[in-house]
């Protein structure tokens, strides 16, 4: 008897996102990510800001940003992954 094999995608705590093509997309991202209770930061090099802060986020939105969550529960982590996948940079070269 063959067992069913399911491939479960592992939830990530970091994504690289880029909003240099649209301030509107950056604003939409901040609005969506603000619905998540966990702390979420945007980082470029040594500069790090609260990803839920529109002003802080827009200051760096023209750069490829590393978005990092410190999840307080599985639901926040799942929602974070759903949001970030919509904006994810598919290939990034430093």
Question: How would you label these PLM feature ranges?
Answer:
Residues 1-7:
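N-terminal amphipathic/basic-hydrophobic helices that include classical n-h-c signal peptides
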Residues 8-19:
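Short glycine-/aliphatic-rich beta-strand segments at the starts of folded cytosolic domains
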Residues 11, 63-67:
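Short glycine-rich, basic-tinged beta-strand/loop micro-motifs
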Residues 17-21, 69-73:
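Short beta-strand-to-loop capping motifs
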Residues 22-34, 47-63, 76-85:
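Amphipathic alpha-helical interaction surfaces in cytosolic regulatory modules
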Residues 40-45, 85-94:
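Conserved short beta-strand edge segments in small beta-sheet-based binding/regulatory domains
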Residues 45-46, 72:
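Short, ordered loop/turn segments at secondary-structure junctions
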């Amino acid at each position: 008897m063959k067992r069913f094999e399911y491939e479960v995608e592992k939830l990530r705590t970091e994504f690289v996102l880029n909003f240099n093509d649209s301030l509107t997309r950056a604003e939409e991202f901040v609005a969506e990510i603000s619905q998540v209770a966990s702390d979420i930061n945007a980082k470029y090099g040594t500069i790090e800001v609260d990803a839920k802060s529109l002003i802080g986020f827009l200051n760096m939105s023209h750069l490829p940003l590393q978005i990092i969550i410190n999840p307080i529960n599985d639901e926040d982590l799942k929602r974070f992954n759903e949001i970030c996948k919509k904006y994810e940079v598919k290939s990034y070269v430093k």
